[in-house]
C-alpha cells in the first residue's frame, strides 16, 4: 500500500512508531494479559505509566518544580471554561488577546461565564499590505489589575503563529493546543499552559494543563469537579476515571519524542518542513498565503489557489496521490496543511511535488 500522509488539523496523525507499538501491545499491555484500555487506572502498573509520562513531559519541556502537570478530560474548549471558573472569582478581571478563531472562541466563553467579573479584549491582528500581521501591545502601559492575560500563540484556522514571547506584568495563560512541544518555550514565563492532546500529544479526549502553584491561590468559582484544577492536583489527575488510553498514547508520544532528540530536534525539522512548503507557495502566483512571513504558522500552513474553481480538483487529485485532509477550515476556505510533529519530512516533500505538478498542469 502506498504511503498516506494525513494533513488533518486535528485529530492529527500520530507517529508511526507509536501506532505500531500500540498495535503490538493492544491485547497484552506490559505483560498484564489485558489491554491498557481494560486495566484499572488505580493499579500500580498504570500509576507507574502516569508517573513516567509526567516525568518525560517535565524533562522535554523543562518544567520547573513549582508547576503542576495535570492530565484532564476534554479539549481546549473545556479549558476555555476551566480557566475562567478557576481564576476569576466574583470580582476578577482578565484580558484576552484576539489573534484568530480560537482566541476569539476563548474570549466568547469567558464573556459567557464571567458573571460579575470583567473581561477585556484586544484585537492584535492588523493588515500590512493586505496580509495579516500580529502586533503585540505593550502590556506594561495598560493601567489595570488583571488576574491573567490569555492568548493563543498559534491559530490553526487562520494560519497565524506568534513566535515572540509575550511580555506581561500579569500571569500569562496560553492555549498551546497546536504548538506544544513543536518548539522550545520558557515555561517559567507562564502562569498556566493548556493544550488539547489531539494535535501534538495523542488522541482527542485528553488535555494537558501545566499550572504554576501560585495560580491555584486565586479566587475560584469553579462548579464542575472535573474542571477544578485544585481537585486535579490533590488527586493526581484521578478525581474520577481518566481517559486511560489517551494517557497511555500520550506517554508513548513523549517517549518517542525523547528518542529522536527532544523538542530541540523536532523544532529544526518543523522549521524545515514549513520553510519548504512556504517556498513552494511563494515560488509562483498559482498559490497564495495571506499572512506576513514573520507570523506564518509552522504547524498550520494555509493557502489558496489563485483560481478557486480548481479547489475541488486539487483536493480530488491530492487524495489520489495519498495526500489527505488538505481542505481549509469552513470559515476561511482554501487549503490547509497541518505539519505537526508526527508529519514526516517525506510527507511535505510529496505535497510540494504534487503542488508543483498541479500548478504546471493548470497554470
Swiss-Prot record:
It catalyses: O-phospho-L-serine + 2-oxoglutarate = 3-phosphooxypyruvate + L-glutamate; 4-(phosphooxy)-L-threonine + 2-oxoglutarate = (R)-3-hydroxy-2-oxo-4-phosphooxybutanoate + L-glutamate. It is found in: Cytoplasm. The gene is serC. Pathway: Amino-acid biosynthesis; L-serine biosynthesis; L-serine from 3-phospho-D-glycerate: step 2/3; Cofactor biosynthesis; pyridoxine 5'-phosphate biosynthesis; pyridoxine 5'-phosphate from D-erythrose 4-phosphate: step 3/5. Its EC number is 2.6.1.52. GO terms for cellular component: cytoplasm. Keywords: Amino-acid biosynthesis, Aminotransferase, Cytoplasm, Pyridoxal phosphate, Pyridoxine biosynthesis, Serine biosynthesis, Transferase. HAMAP family: SerC_aminotrans_5. Its cofactor is pyridoxal 5'-phosphate. Pyridoxal 5'-phosphate binds at residues 76-77, 102, 156, 175, 198, 240-241. L-glutamate binds at residue 42. One of its GO terms (molecular function) is pyridoxal phosphate binding. GO terms for biological process: L-serine biosynthetic process; pyridoxine biosynthetic process. Catalyzes the reversible conversion of 3-phosphohydroxypyruvate to phosphoserine and of 3-hydroxy-2-oxo-4-phosphonooxybutanoate to phosphohydroxythreonine. Its main location: cytoplasm. The lineage of its organism: Bacteria, Pseudomonadati, Pseudomonadota, Gammaproteobacteria, Alteromonadales. Belongs to the class-V pyridoxal-phosphate-dependent aminotransferase family. SerC subfamily. SUPFAM superfamilies: PLP-dependent transferases (SSF53383). This is Phosphoserine aminotransferase. The modification N6-(pyridoxal phosphate)lysine is found at residue 199.
Amino acid at each position: 500500500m502506498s504511503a498516506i500522509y494525513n494533513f488533518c488539523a486535528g485529530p492529527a496523525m500520530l507517529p508511526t512508531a507509536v501506532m505500531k507499538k500500540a498495535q503490538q501491545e493492544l491485547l497484552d499491555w506490559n505483560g498484564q494479559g489485558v489491554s491498557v484500555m481494560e486495566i484499572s487506572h488505580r493499579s500500580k502498573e498504570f500509576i507507574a505509566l502516569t508517573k513516567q509520562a509526567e516525568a518525560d513531559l517535565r524533562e522535554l519541556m523543562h518544567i520547573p518544580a513549582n508547576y503542576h502537570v495535570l492530565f484532564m478530560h476534554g479539549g481546549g474548549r473545556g479549558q476555555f471554561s476551566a480557566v475562567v471558573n478557576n481564576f476569576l472569582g466574583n470580582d476578577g478581571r482578565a484580558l484576552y488577546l484576539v489573534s484568530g478563531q480560537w482566541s476569539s472562541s476563548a474570549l466568547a466563553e469567558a464573556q459567557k461565564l464571567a458573571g460579575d467579573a470583567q473581561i477585556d479584549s484586544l484585537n492584535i491582528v492588523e493588515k500590512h499590505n493586505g496580509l495579516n500581521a500580529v502586533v503585540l501591545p505593550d502590556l506594561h502601559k495598560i493601567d489595570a489589575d488583571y488576574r491573567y492575560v490569555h492568548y493563543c500563540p498559534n491559530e490553526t484556522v487562520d494560519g497565524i503563529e506568534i513566535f515572540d514571547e509575550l511580555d506581561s506584568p500579569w500571569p500569562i495563560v496560553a492555549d498551546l493546543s497546536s504548538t506544544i512541544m513543536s518548539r522550545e518555550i520558557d515555561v517559567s514565563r507562564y502562569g498556566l499552559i493548556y493544550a488539547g492532546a489531539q494535535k501534538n500529544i495523542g488522541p482527542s479526549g485528553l488535555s494537558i494543563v501545566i499550572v504554576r502553584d501560585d495560580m491555584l491561590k486565586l479566587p475560584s468559582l469553579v462548579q464542575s469537579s472535573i474542571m477544578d484544577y485544585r481537585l486535579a492536583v490533590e488527586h493526581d489527575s484521578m478525581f474520577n476515571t481518566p481517559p486511560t488510553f489517551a494517557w497511555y498514547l500520550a506517554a508513548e508520544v513523549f517517549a518517542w519524542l525523547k528518542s529522536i532528540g527532544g523538542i530541540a530536534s523536532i523544532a529544526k525539522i518543523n522549521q524545515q518542513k514549513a520553510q519548504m512548503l512556504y517556498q513552494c507557495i511563494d515560488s509562483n502566483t498559482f498559490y497564495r498565503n495571506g499572512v506576513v512571513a514573520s507570523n506564518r504558522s509552522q504547524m498550520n500552513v494555509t493557502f489558496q489557489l489563485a483560481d478557486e474553481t480548481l479547489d475541488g480538483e486539487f483536493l480530488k487529485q491530492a487524495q489520489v496521490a495519498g495526500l489527505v485532509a488538505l481542505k481549509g477550515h469552513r470559515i476561511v476556505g482554501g487549503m490547509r496543511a497541518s505539519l505537526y510533529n508526527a508529519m514526516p519530512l517525506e510527507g511535505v516533500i510529496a505535497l510540494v511535488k504534487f503542488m508543483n505538478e498541479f500548478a504546471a498542469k493548470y497554470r
